[in-house]
Amino acid sequence: MPFKPLSVLPTAALTVALTTALTVALAGAPASARAETIRVAIGTQDTTINCATGGLLIRELKLLEKYLPRDGRYKEVRYDIQWKNFTSGAPLTSEMVADKLDIGSMADFPGSNNGAAFLKAGKRSVFITVLSGSTLGSGNGIVVPRDSKVTLLSELKGHTISVPFASTAHGMLLRAVAAQGWDPQKDVTIITQAPEVAGPALQAGRIEAHADFVPFVELFEHRGVARKIYDGAQANAPTYHGSLVSADYAARYPEVVVAFLRAALEADRLIAAEPEKYSLLIEQVTGIDAAVNYLYHGPLGLQTRDLTWKPEYRQALRTSIETLKLMGRDSPLNADSFIDDRYIRAAFKQSGLDYEQRLVNRDKLPLKAVDATTGRPITDVQRAAGIWVQGEPKVRHYASIENALADLRRIEAAGGKARAVYVHDLIHRIKLLAPTSWYAIDAKGQLSAFLQRDAAAAYAAANRGRVLDFAGAKAAGSTAL
């Protein structure tokens, strides 16, 4: 459903000094834009919550208006800002190719489709920034119905797996199937199914497994209809969501593109400082539970917001272009020319940020907190946990799962309720929803969390322990402290 254009805020004139990296783009720009109306039509994917800093937050907080150029060649310009929301990248791409949109955000795989579609139409689009991603591959995953006995991807041979067609999850699924040594045409049946259809189907047990992208795997888990058995991190295949722009538009209005990216950088700063506040805003706009939004956007999140073109993300795009061939969609698209980092580098410079410093930083958003039960700083996050208590503005943090679950028992005994409980997979270092995770308790009573039961069992066997589900872990953790 399209959003109404947002009004332009009356702000002071902004001096826009592009870096020398934009000289070529500026050389081809018109000498004057006086009395011109410039359309800034942006396609968003609001429910794809890791795109929030390139769409939803910019729109809701009116950040674009703050940075659009209003002096020099833009002194007399009127901006026609348009927003349109999509549930996936494919229809967004169609409207970009049809020149109904100028900028859009999507993942690496649908982004490669975007570039290929532009080339087929005799045009070009360029990938201008990453918004959020995982150098390991988290963000895509495979779930089964909550009560399914399937615990591993290998158990799905000969079965049916649904997935949103041409999505980044589709690309992940094809690569995961190939890694199993399976023929995707013979050893597994892959059918197309949108998230809004898959949710009820999982709940009713009408599908055996479903692959999806941010945030639906975790949303289905959180709402109790599914259980994740495979995370993209297991394939060690980097993935990201980012923003693209029509190359012609960027050449005509490079300062407008940089303004959009400066707005994205501010959105990133705001959500990093107050992840709970903006997770609630995302829930208000999209209906995606704040607990799931925080799983991605909070400290040590399942993905990391990152607006730099790390080598892993460049490789992710190359892999996505190669995956097109698995679908019979060969294209002359080249990742090196498809990515254009001049605009994001200029945005960093104008925002007083060091692009090169961020480029080499692979750390997740750090956790700077004290244990809610002991008051001591949390210095080792390997077994850190968190509880977002319903009605509380901030997540409580803990140095151990035992401390968290002991506190959870006290919260519930006092009539409180947890909006969410978070733990971290000991092997893959990814943030998990505690109720659907597996646990191993060792001989010393220390709890460790795992995505998969077999990993928990292996750890328990090696440490004279036993495997527990969440209920068992709660009972064990209640005796901590």
Per-region residue spans from a language model:
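Pocket-lining segment of extracytoplasmic ligand-binding domains
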Residues: 185, 191, 196-285, 402, ...
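Ligand-binding clefts/hinges and TM-proximal coupling segments of bilobed small-molecule sensing domains
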Residues: 75-77, 160, 164-175, 180, ...
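Sec/Tat signal peptide C-region and signal peptidase I cleavage site
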Residues: 26-35
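Short, glycine-/small- and polar/acidic-enriched structural segments
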Residues: 36-183, 189-192, 208, 237
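A bilobed periplasmic-binding-protein/Venus flytrap-type ligand-binding module shared by bacterial periplasmic
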Residues: 58, 139-149, 239-255, 440-442
